[in-house]
Curated annotation (Swiss-Prot):
It comes from Lens culinaris. This is Non-specific lipid-transfer protein 2. It comes from the Eukaryota. Residues 1-25 form the signal peptide. One of its GO terms (biological process) is lipid transport. One of its GO terms (molecular function) is lipid binding.
Length: 118
C-alpha cells in the first residue's frame, strides 16, 4: 500500500510539471491522477478494474468536454503511463473499454495527443 501511494505521488508530481506550461483552464494532471489512482492495480497487471477505477474513468471522460481538455488529459495519461515502471500496456489500452467508455485514442506512451479532438 505504501509503495502504491509513493508511486501515485510520483505520478502526480510528474503530471503537474508536464501540464503546467500548457494549462489554460484545461484539466489538470492532478485531477487525472486523482480520478485514475484506483486503477493502479489493474494498470500494473492486476485483475479487472474496480468499480472505483471505472468511476474515475467515467468522471474524467465527463470532465474532458473540450478539445483542450481532452488533449490535456491525453498528455497527463501519456506522462503517467511512462512513469509507471511495471505498466501492463495491454491493460492500459483496454482500460476505457473495460469500464464501458470509448475514448478516441489508446492510453499509451506513444499517443500523439495533438491529434485528439472533441
Amino acid at each position: 500500500m505504501a509503495r502504491g501511494m509513493k508511486l501515485a505521488c510520483v505520478v502526480l508530481v510528474i503530471c503537474m510539471v508536464v501540464i503546467a506550461p500548457m494549462a489554460e483552464g484545461a484539466i489538470s494532471c492532478g485531477a487525472v491522477t486523482s480520478d485514475l489512482s484506483p486503477c493502479l492495480t489493474y494498470l500494473t497487471g492486476g485483475p479487472g478494474p474496480s468499480p472505483q477505477c471505472c468511476g474515475g474513468v467515467k468522471k474524467l471522460l465527463a470532465a474532458a468536454n473540450t478539445t483542450p481538455d481532452r488533449q490535456a488529459a491525453c498528455n497527463c495519461l501519456k506522462s503517467a503511463a511512462g512513469s509507471i515502471t511495471k505498466l501492463n500496456t495491454n491493460n492500459a489500452a483496454a482500460l476505457p473499454g473495460k469500464c464501458g467508455v470509448n475514448i478516441p485514442y489508446k492510453i499509451s506512451t506513444t499517443t500523439n495527443c495533438n491529434t485528439v479532438k472533441f
